[in-house]
Amino acid sequence: ILNLLGQLSGIATNAAHWATIAPRQVAATRKTVWGLLDKWAVHLGGGLTHRLNKDDATMIKENDLAVTEQSGMQAIVALLSTMDVSECGAFLELEVTNEKDAIVAATTWKQRQESESLPQLVLMLDNFGPDRSKEMVTELTDMGLRDSVVIEASGNIIFDDLEAWRECGVDVLSTSAINRGTAPLDVSMLIDQ
């Protein structure tokens, strides 16, 4: 039990370190060793847990788009136009790997919001980096689309680069670095007689 406590305490401490320094909210990804225990430790440290399991929210990743009848932007439009939001859980998230897909997704979602009462779409910018993310946020703002989306940056986000993310304008940074490879705290137990 000491090993488990040490590991989870290390994750909570690391999450607190990230949450204190990060310019915005920081979330753990699905990549955990101890599952819900890792997620709870991240939560205790001040980070977001993202999804605890797949049923908590709907996340559409590039592999999901690849197996649809349409391809690329057509698949994004088709999915976002017809998705039953009441079945999505806490939120609906779409992973995009390029600027065109991000704009198509935000435009499609905004058009749907104009005729339906819908929450913001979570738009995950995968491997965009701080500079590209900042340009994307600016472009979405200039196009009047920014209010329709929550922007999450993910992919290769490390603690040493947090300062570079400060001015990019994303809402959430998600990374497995919060909980994976975290050094455990040195916990010991003494029994008095």
Predicted segment positions?
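Short, polar loop motifs at secondary-structure junctions
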Residues: 99, 128, 158
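Catalytic-pocket segment enriched in acidic/His residues
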Residues: 140, 158-159
